[in-house]
């Protein structure tokens, strides 16, 4: 009993511990609550300013989920030569059903099989099969339910502008990819990669394109990304085997040859052709092709990340004993928009084939994130969170808000039964720990005392700690809540498109224009930026940091009517008229473009106004909010159909209005609204609420709206003038009518 009683802490000791905890609880809780509130405020502001502009994963989505392998998609390319291919958006292919003028890459995404009933995280490794005027596209699709690759197939009847998902062509118990499809002796075969099975299999179509049967095992080795080509009287097989001894992954290439694609196959004398250096493009990057008598091989440059880009090689010598290839230019311009481009980070596979017309068509996959990006972002996010927590704990401890008390009895042996316990290793270890903890405690106390002094150095120290904490909170929010960090374009009816930005400016605003161009040129759907130069010495196009072409259109007369002048060089139907003193996120711009594509007969913009009263009076957005609706959209930030809007503005019926605009140097946007309303009995305007927008016009000495009251008075007179000529504006449209909430 005595031994048992000794095991319990004494009453006085327990009371002391409880008293210390009670005394520390209140300031500790208050400090932690305050720190959490501060972190939440910082994180909330950062989320609103930065993260809210990213395309965030939909928690209700069944496909297109974040995946460590990437977010691969597939694009179409055309050209007179396989060495000079251009993306589909530069070919002027359109689809009015999806308001895609033009259709833009990517043409196939994870949404394609997902909407077809087969949820997928990405699509990659595309191979074409040309059958007359019909294109069949076979590709790897990362199935959500099994988290492995299956072979999907889609069909196009318009040479790749639109695609219909047909289903899953091949599904095995192991991962499948790289579906090399070819025809031999009137049979259609598929040779997919399935290296987990440790053999290279050949399948034959029994009912093309969805039903296949195993024909035979070609090679009993786990070959990767195998491609066939018939050349100089033999069939050649190019592949990689990463199980070879001393081989660097993604850096090995070997060749096999045979008289028939059905085998038997013999190894090339020089195998392995490559065995190290992932940047050389050893791993195949698609189908080999013959052009003007020469054989070309696409390979993957895997330096930095898997599948970083496609390299093209011209094969100068290929025999059973010798092999030589030299790099040549791929002929495809690399994306410049980083994560905001569907292939901005990597592209690792291309399949180019010649059509009966003589032209060439190609499919290529691409990704906006590097390999392992989702895992890396989670790691960085949690590290930022833990560092922020550690800093809060440190500051609380130093300031005395948080205390850590360890009772001395913790280190005392729990029994007195035997004095021999004093010589046991456990007891010696306890004494050593106690000495160390006492020493650490003294040092901590001394540090707390020094940091408690009110000196400028201590103030600076805690400011630095606070700054580091703020940075880590932002890091945590950015990487944990920011999706893949891209401001992605939205699709309409499964297709992407592009628009042209038009802005009007003067010499005095050149500094502003440069910021404008640099920012908006990175938006994914922007095709070109047209600068309407109204006055002064104009710059050259190369004066701007832009990822898209910038065209300076110099006007002879300084007039606001120039904003809507017809321009035959504009290659897109959609135009975003945007003042050069307005800055908003690319994500908001992309939302506006999607809404316009849903209703291309409307003007879709970001600045609503409610025009009413007798007589009509021009008021700000606050008035529209008070009225809970709007009937006018300012064209200083609005999408419109350039073919309709520009021709309408420069029609004979609009001449009196244009003359009034030119005379008053104001109200061109109001005139456009009256012309739209006069041309249709249906709705003509729609609003999209931006996450945030910065209007720098008040900072400019040349802005016509700098004097607000004078500006409003002029516009009120414009309303009376235009109403007398063109009739009234439409009735009010309520905010918050869209299901997605973009117009609240």
UniProtKB/Swiss-Prot annotation:
<feature type="binding site">
    <location>
        <begin position="579"/>
        <end position="581"/>
    </location>
    <ligand>
        <name>substrate</name>
    </ligand>
</feature>
<feature type="binding site">
    <location>
        <begin position="558"/>
        <end position="563"/>
    </location>
    <ligand>
        <name>substrate</name>
    </ligand>
</feature>
<keyword id="KW-1133">Transmembrane helix</keyword>
<keyword id="KW-0464">Manganese</keyword>
<protein>
    <recommendedName>
        <fullName>Glucosamine inositolphosphorylceramide transferase 1</fullName>
        <ecNumber>2.4.99.-</ecNumber>
    </recommendedName>
</protein>
<dbReference type="Pfam" id="PF09258">
    <property type="entry name" value="Glyco_transf_64"/>
</dbReference>
<keyword id="KW-0812">Transmembrane</keyword>
<comment type="pathway">
    <text>Sphingolipid metabolism.</text>
</comment>
<dbReference type="Pfam" id="PF24793">
    <property type="entry name" value="GINT1_N"/>
</dbReference>
<dbReference type="GO" id="GO:0006486">
    <property type="term" value="P:protein glycosylation"/>
</dbReference>
<feature type="binding site">
    <location>
        <position position="581"/>
    </location>
    <ligand>
        <name>Mn(2+)</name>
    </ligand>
</feature>
<comment type="similarity">
    <text>Belongs to the glycosyltransferase 64 family.</text>
</comment>
<dbReference type="InterPro" id="IPR029044">
    <property type="entry name" value="Nucleotide-diphossugar_trans"/>
</dbReference>
<dbReference type="InterPro" id="IPR056442">
    <property type="entry name" value="GINT1_N"/>
</dbReference>
<dbReference type="InterPro" id="IPR015338">
    <property type="entry name" value="GT64_dom"/>
</dbReference>
<keyword id="KW-0472">Membrane</keyword>
<dbReference type="InterPro" id="IPR004263">
    <property type="entry name" value="Exostosin"/>
</dbReference>
<feature type="transmembrane region" description="Helical; Name=3">
    <location>
        <begin position="460"/>
        <end position="480"/>
    </location>
</feature>
<feature type="binding site">
    <location>
        <position position="609"/>
    </location>
    <ligand>
        <name>substrate</name>
    </ligand>
</feature>
<dbReference type="GO" id="GO:0030259">
    <property type="term" value="P:lipid glycosylation"/>
</dbReference>
<feature type="active site">
    <location>
        <position position="669"/>
    </location>
</feature>
<feature type="transmembrane region" description="Helical; Name=2">
    <location>
        <begin position="378"/>
        <end position="398"/>
    </location>
</feature>
<dbReference type="InterPro" id="IPR023296">
    <property type="entry name" value="Glyco_hydro_beta-prop_sf"/>
</dbReference>
<feature type="binding site">
    <location>
        <begin position="665"/>
        <end position="669"/>
    </location>
    <ligand>
        <name>substrate</name>
    </ligand>
</feature>
<feature type="transmembrane region" description="Helical; Name=1">
    <location>
        <begin position="31"/>
        <end position="51"/>
    </location>
</feature>
<dbReference type="GO" id="GO:0016757">
    <property type="term" value="F:glycosyltransferase activity"/>
</dbReference>
<comment type="function">
    <text>Essential protein. Glycosyltransferase that mediates the glycosylation of glycosylinositol phosphorylceramides (GIPCs), the major sphingolipids in the plasma membrane; acts as a HexN(Ac)-specific GIPC sugar transferase. Responsible for the glycosylation of a subgroup of GIPCs found in seeds and pollen that contain GlcNAc and GlcN (GlcN(Ac)). Maybe involved in the maintenance of cell-cell adhesion.</text>
</comment>
<keyword id="KW-0808">Transferase</keyword>
<dbReference type="GO" id="GO:0016020">
    <property type="term" value="C:membrane"/>
</dbReference>
<feature type="binding site">
    <location>
        <position position="534"/>
    </location>
    <ligand>
        <name>substrate</name>
    </ligand>
</feature>
<keyword id="KW-0479">Metal-binding</keyword>
<feature type="disulfide bond">
    <location>
        <begin position="667"/>
        <end position="718"/>
    </location>
</feature>
<dbReference type="GO" id="GO:0046872">
    <property type="term" value="F:metal ion binding"/>
</dbReference>
<keyword id="KW-1015">Disulfide bond</keyword>
